[in-house]
Amino acid sequence: MPRALIPPSNPIWPDGNRCAVALAFDVDGPTGDAMLDGSLLHNFRYFSEGAYGPWRALPRLLDLLADYGLKATFFVPTWVVQHWTDRCEKILGGGHEIAYHGHRHEVFMDCSPQRQLEIMMVSREIFQSRLGVTPVGFRTPSGDWSEETANLLADFGVIYSSSMRGDDRPYFHLRGDGSRALVEIPARPDIDDYTALAYFEDPDFPAGLDRISDYRLVEQNWCREFQGYYRDGLCWTTILHPKVVAKPGRLGILEGLFKDIRRHENVWIAHCAEVADWWTAQDKIVEG
């Protein structure tokens, strides 16, 4: 089993801030299972539902983040970078971070280590050639990875992951010899918009979901989640998708959430990479 270093109970954040907020969005577009199994080629409506994310929803989301002076991390499959390069350039132009999320949203848990490395190499080349950046962060597509993935990512130059769910503070994945592999910034499914807002008739995804939650209740739930992390001094990140949450009617949910974050004092708004750098630096201070 992969090993992890248990984090301190009471994290310390820069400049005396009470908690950390690392907003994160997955710009999946039409990538994912239907692209991987080939069915997307024969389902143009489903393709258009995914394409709506980078084409229409992403610019709207970037404008809202700018309105509230918030920065975020965007995990982007590089197939999306290839097909909507200009939209991805606007992410960087807005002062946000871009990070790895597979090429076509592959299921890393089902990929051999060699295949995982191939995907990372393809992704890096596309990020460098299209956007002139080399990401340092990773969120596993489809939510899980194999036992070898953490070490593979660290050897590839990745410094953090936001893939696991088992804590509300950053922690370190450990190598077999006990040394640090990379920082984990865990995100909880409580703040995954698919849980409350995603509904596709065909294919049936998420399976069995036959309703959309009341937007007012979704906003209240997400604000409560943030408030709990603020109260306890933790690190709050999100699993949100422009194609799901950044539609005209739903943008009010995000606006209510952003207002609530801004109403609270001593909140460190950070890229995930900044959280990882801080966590690593604090660990070195403790060791020293």
Predicted segments with their positions:
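Catalytic alpha-helical scaffold of carbohydrate-active enzymes acting on polysaccharides/glycoconjugates
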Residues: M1-G137, S142-D190, R216-T238, A246-G288
